Amino acid sequence: MNNRVHQGHLARKRFGQNFLNDQFVIDSIVSAINPQKGQAMVEIGPGLAALTEPVGERLDQLTVIELDRDLAARLQTHPFLGPKLTIYQQDAMTFNFGELAEKMGQPLRVFGNLPYNISTPLMFHLFSYTDAIADMHFMLQKEVVNRLVAGPNSKAYGRLSVMAQYYCNVIPVLEVPPSAFTPPPKVDSAVVRLVPHATMPHPVKDVRVLSRITTEAFNQRRKTIRNSLGNLFSVEVLTGMGIDPAMRAENISVAQYCQMANYLAENAPFQES
């Protein structure tokens, strides 16, 4: 039997499709999301409706974003969900979540079992809309969740950690084995909750500068920042900020990256390349 076929649908590798089918895991995720009537609930990649059905049962209206034309068509004719659903058959990577929040008149509660092949770039896309989002619950590759929650001085800590924690409070929810999916992925999975900060703990003047600094630092993570960021900061400037130039990218805290970004924004304003 082809284990890529589930409920009559052939999982498509190009969309990174792995369908959740473990009822205990599904119930645990829905409990963590805790959807309530009247909230602007949005699901990314509903697939075969493993989460859509139990979430939709609790709601009068649910918005879903599904790239796969066949799956979007299945949802339109769903026996009890169909009338409740607003379906956008498009790519979440280019979706305007700000416009949707404005249309719905409130911040969005976003959730989904994200395709692992686009999960990291999709997270960065969503971070640009955190002022329009109340919270997010996602099933991701466990390694990605580890990176999201990692602190300084750990191997998992990287640019994704810094940017996620700049925008959100990041909370791991539960771990999920490959056996919970059809077809089973080759990696472990985990669910994470991301809640955008109501008040930024480390505000930056220009987030593009923070993005640039973290990109340059972590692209050369084995180098000391004296070398990896030497084109942006002198040793004297780093020392003046209380940052040891002999540290590496993984040793610098989110607060320190934000401090560096604000210095650079004030002294060398961002130029579009």
Swiss-Prot record:
The answer on whether this UniProt entry bears the keyword Cytoplasm reads yes
- Which one Pfam family would you cite for this protein? RrnaAD
The record's section on Gene3D superfamilies has:
Ribosomal RNA adenine dimethylase-like, domain 2 (1.10.8.100), Vaccinia Virus protein VP39 (3.40.50.150)
Record SMART domains? rADc
GO molecular function: any one?
A: 16S rRNA (adenine(1518)-N(6)/adenine(1519)-N(6))-dimethyltransferase activity
Keywords tagged on the record: Cytoplasm, Methyltransferase, RNA-binding, rRNA processing, S-adenosyl-L-methionine, Transferase
One annotated Gene Ontology cellular component of this protein: cytosol
Organism domain of life: Bacteria
Question: Where does it reside?
Answer: Cytoplasm
Keyword Hydrolase assigned to the entry: answer is: no
InterPro entries assigned to the protein according to its UniProt record, in alphabetical order: KsgA/Erm, rRNA_Ade_diMease-like_C, rRNA_Ade_Mease_Trfase_CS, rRNA_Ade_methylase_Trfase_N, rRNA_adenine_dimethylase, SAM-dependent_MTases_sf
Q: Which HAMAP family did the record assign?
A: 16SrRNA_methyltr_A
Q: What's the family?
A: Belongs to the class I-like SAM-binding methyltransferase superfamily. rRNA adenine N(6)-methyltransferase family. RsmA subfamily.
Give the protein's biological function: Specifically dimethylates two adjacent adenosines (A1518 and A1519) in the loop of a conserved hairpin near the 3'-end of 16S rRNA in the 30S particle. May play a critical role in biogenesis of 30S subunits.
Instruction: Provide the protein name.
Output: Ribosomal RNA small subunit methyltransferase A
**Which organism is this entry from?**
Escherichia coli O157:H7
